[in-house]
Amino acid sequence: MLNATSAEVLAEPAQVGAVVAAALDRAGPGLTGQRRITETFRSSGVSGELINALVSSEPATRASAARLCGALRLSEAVIWIEDLLQDKDPTVRDAAVRALAELGGRRAIEALMGSVNRISLHRLAIALARGATDIDIEALMRQPGSEKAATVTVLACGLRRDALRVAPLLGIAHDRRWPVQVRIAACRSLGMIGDPSAVGGLDVLAEKDPDAGIKKAAAQAWRRLQGPKRLRPA
């Protein structure tokens, strides 16, 4: 039984969120442990009050509620948290992005990508890297909604250190039908992933691609894969 009111929980979102995160880690990756933890909040009525707090007139309360709904993986809160992506208060918007990343799932990812033009590129890439499944990433790479959506998805692959995406990323980096910024992002992600199988493809781009930005990004990724002892000649 939870011995705390929603007001007490909302007053300490960081501390409560940390406790919940630690409990979820101990429970393991399965849904059983997660449900056991969230049920404690549901049975006490606190989870419902947290969702109601998402529409509070106080920005600090909305932000705290979003953070806690994310920490508790309250999937029924996604539709309300999505609205907070357009909140006037930047702290609330940031809390909403973080919450959706923690929640994950198709609806949360759709909400994030639906706000691709309102969230900074790198902030969205971090959220996507955290919240998206492999299936989500594959679908977004196959049919990105815009150049920025493609760039964000490609960067998320690098942030996830997703070695399974090396071949597709090399394909994007070499394919001049893709916008330059997406190709540059692919080079950067290959550098972040650090898989040596990308060295040859990056070497070709660094030497022969006609675009200076691509050459620079490929050379930087190449050097990162080679390590500090081998520097590419100018």
Model-based region annotation:
Residues 17, 34, 62, 93, ...:
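Residue-level detector of extended alpha-helical repeat arrays and alpha-solenoid scaffolds
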Residues 59, 69, 183-207, 211:
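Extended alpha-helical scaffolding segments
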